[in-house]
């Protein structure tokens, strides 16, 4: 089926490399960065500016600024056949025409979020322990994330359940896509894959790389080699 007419939920099935990036306001290179990362094989790209260097320097993104940044990411995602994700905000996801809305444990109830964004976009959920993971398997989210695998500066103060949660999730063999998240980089990726994950979310492994395209290519190759 042509990718242009595939639904996001169908494209999600093939996705294995999920990138969260801030708006890179202090660098002013969001378009170039996104193009490089997506050219390297990133399947989903999410804007998450909370706690970023740009937020510290310029303050929180206002809704209009967030939509402008998402427009840049959406353009790159279209050109590379990737999925665009919005974090937390169903209204922003709707306004941006996003493919994906990602919800945390304390965000909108699933049915409310679905009522806002409609049926086409996929919805994901963060999980941080075995109980939350079990709920995510049963509830009507399209995918979920498990972690953090390691403590991460993007989630300060959050305990890391570690690879045990990845192993437990793999043992459940969920009938929907799931991603390991939290502190994953090229060096740690083999441990994550050995624990049973075949999809990962990364941040600094690509956002802090001197060559984002090469970093994405290396991560994608390792995931693909794991089968």
Curated annotation (Swiss-Prot):
Binding site for 2-[(2R,5Z)-2-carboxy-4-methylthiazol-5(2H)-ylidene]ethyl phosphate: 152-154, 183
Record's GO cellular component terms: cytoplasm
Cofactor note text: Binds 1 Mg(2+) ion per subunit.
Recorded GO MF terms: magnesium ion binding; thiamine-phosphate diphosphorylase activity
Cofactor(s) it depends on: Mg(2+)
Residues that, per the record, bind Mg(2+): 88, 107
Coiled-coil ranges from the UniProt annotation: none
Keyword Transferase: yes
Biological processes per GO annotation: thiamine biosynthetic process; thiamine diphosphate biosynthetic process
Protein role: Condenses 4-methyl-5-(beta-hydroxyethyl)thiazole monophosphate (THZ-P) and 2-methyl-4-amino-5-hydroxymethyl pyrimidine pyrophosphate (HMP-PP) to form thiamine monophosphate (TMP).
Protein name in UniProt: Thiamine-phosphate synthase
Organism of provenance: Mycolicibacterium smegmatis (strain ATCC 700084 / mc(2)155) (Mycobacterium smegmatis)
Lineage of the species this protein comes from: Bacteria, Bacillati, Actinomycetota, Actinomycetes, Mycobacteriales
